[in-house]
Amino acid sequence: MDPQLTEVSQQFERFKAAFARKDYNTCSDLLSQLKVLLTKFTSLPPLFENSPNAAKELTIARDIYEHAVVLSVKTEDQDAFERDFFQLKPYYVDARNRIPQSPQENLILGLNLLRLLVQNRIAEFHTELELLSSATLEDPCIKHAVELEQSFMEGAYNRVLSARQTAPDATYVYFMDLLAKTIRDEIAGCSEKAYDYVSISDARQMLLFSSDQELLTYVTDEHPEWEVKEGFVVFQKAKETAPCKEIPSLQLINQTLSYARELERIV
C-alpha cells in the first residue's frame, strides 16, 4: 500500500478508537492531523486526479469527513458541523460515479436538514431538498426531517416534540432537543406577554411538558425571572411603556406656515 495511504489509515484507526471510548478531545486533535494528511492526496476534490489508489483515497477521505460531522454533533459544535459537511458534500455529489455510495450518506444528509431547520434557514432547507433524488426523499432519515419541518411550519408543536421518540438515529437527538427548546422559548415568550400568571397545570400543557417537575426545572434554568407560588407560575411583569408626550401640534403648524412664507419670499 502507498505509504501516505498507510499513514492516513493508521491515524484514522486511532481516531475511531478514541471516538469509541468517547475521548472527543483526542478525536479533535487527530482529526486536525488527518485533514492535513489528506491534502497530500491529489485524487480528492477539487482536483480528482487519476491515480492507482484514487478510489481508496476518496473512500477513506469521505469516511473521515463523515466521522468529523458526527463528532461535531457529539461536541455540540454547529459551526464545525457546517464546515465539515461542506467538505464532505463533494464526495456525495462530484465523486458519486467514482466510488460506491456511503451507507451513512442519507443519515448525514438528514442531519444537515435538521441543522438548517433548527437554525431557521428554511429557504436553504428546501434548496437542499431540491437536490435530492426521489429515491433519497423516501429514505427514513430524510422523511423524518421533512415531516418535522412540515409540523414545525404548521405549528403542530406536539408532533415536533413527539418526533424525538422516532428519530432514526441517536445523533438526531441533539438537534431535536435544540428544536424543542426553540419551540418552548417561543411559547414562553408569547405566554408572558399574554398573561400575568397561569396555573402550573396550564403552564405545563402550554409548554408541552409531561410532568410538573420538568416544567419547574425549565423555569429554574431558563426563566429565573418567573415566580412559582401557590400553584401558579407568575410571569415577569412587562415594563410599562412610558406615556407618549403630547405632540405640540399648534407649534408645528405655526413653524410650517413660517417656513412656507420664507420660501415664498425666496421664490
Swiss-Prot record:
The keyword Ubl conjugation applies. Pfam families: CSN8_PSD8_EIF3K (PF10075). Residues 79-251 form the PCI domain. InterPro entries: 26S_Psome_Rpn12, CSN8_PSD8_EIF3K, PCI_dom. The modification N-acetylmethionine is found at M1. It comes from the Eukaryota. Ubiquitous with highest expression in flowers. Disruption phenotype: Decreased rate of leaf formation, reduced root elongation, delayed skotomorphogenesis and altered growth responses to exogenous cytokinins. Increased sensitivity to heat shock and increased tolerance to oxidative stress. Decreased 26S proteasome accumulation. In flowers and cotyledons, epidermal cells were larger than those in the wild type. Disulfide bonds: none annotated. Keywords: Acetylation, Cytokinin signaling pathway, Proteasome, Ubl conjugation. Signal peptide: none annotated. Component of the 19S regulatory particle (RP/PA700) lid subcomplex of the 26S proteasome. The 26S proteasome is composed of a core protease (CP), known as the 20S proteasome, capped at one or both ends by the 19S regulatory particle (RP/PA700). The RP/PA700 complex is composed of at least 17 different subunits in two subcomplexes, the base and the lid, which form the portions proximal and distal to the 20S proteolytic core, respectively. Interacts with PUB22 and PUB23. Binds to the translation initiation factors TIF3E1. Interacts with UCH1 and UCH2. PANTHER family: 26S PROTEASOME NON-ATPASE REGULATORY SUBUNIT 8 (PTHR12387:SF0). Belongs to the proteasome subunit S14 family. This is 26S proteasome non-ATPase regulatory subunit 8 homolog A. The lineage of its organism: Eukaryota, Viridiplantae, Streptophyta, Embryophyta, Tracheophyta. The gene is RPN12A.
